């Protein structure tokens, strides 16, 4: 890859003034060779493999960050879904496996580890159910373990039994963790991807290599600055500016990923183009949409502006890398985006509007705080709605929702760090309990029949 001097100067400016960073280098690790019928042996095998494969990740990231002057904010691990790996133990709880993941991740110094997961889009095995029922206690007794459940897909439909259980699991997690913080580490997916480097939804797919490096970049501030400094007038010109900026961002991520792959002797997997915001001023997706001409994110026109942004990011990134994957779009996590927080506090950005926005971007209803007395069936209904958007539109959608015990609409909750803070948003008063409790499966749509 040839790098021009002009690109280097632009990169320096992106880092110094516009909050550009490589958000994560994530190593995906296959755990199938760790399987044992004895859960203690399984845990030891898992610990040994993670600490062996991932031992140099943090040092490598620090070296590359210093070498290129680009912040690499997080180093993470994703593993094969534990419901698959622990099935042979026939244990009645997988909390000890989550604790092993936590211990191994801390031993090598990474920020998070994902893969305490179950893929149940068409049905739940006994192991899947054990894992899902273990999630609340696992989130309570670990610090950096992330969990995910894939409850639907375009090819399989939506598993409503799993949706109901997911709602109950999130509700229970909220009740036993401080201010529901455990729920910030749980994502419920439709059409989950196997190579996602971002938390909390990362897991290492069964079709992946023994180990692989996936990189996530982040540059909302860079895109906003590019629009501010451009003379674009029409939306066609705006899209062109975003596309060219995404190209530059992606080139940096590609360079870091290839270098990390070489140093760690692990194959380079994908580069995720997603614009991932932070609570810092100047690092907001919402402010990009406002720069396009919206007075506040969430007003009429927001979904169209977001569709333009998401598409232009993809087009620019695809030109810059032949290894684009993961989620690759624009994230809209309420608590992690300064502009989203302001729009929600103003009452303009609502849960309904966020749901509409998820139809055109990555990935879904993300980091949304709701009242602590929100019933489990309402959470399940929100998950089902979001999954339906993903299923029908053949895209990944997800829900990361936090019922905050003791809080109600008008309150706010502080999560800290990259997770930021969020105003508690209202949910509908009507009930979907009878609908959710019907169970069964919402059949796959006609567009699933592509062969």
Curated annotation (Swiss-Prot):
Xref: HAMAP family: UPF0210
Organism: Neisseria meningitidis serogroup A / serotype 4A (strain DSM 15465 / Z2491)
Family: Belongs to the UPF0210 family.
Protein name: UPF0210 protein NMA1908
Quaternary context: Homodimer.
Listed InterPro entries: UPF0210 (IPR007841)
Database matches in PANTHER family: UPF0210 PROTEIN MJ1665 (PTHR37560:SF1), UPF0210 PROTEIN SPR0218 (PTHR37560)
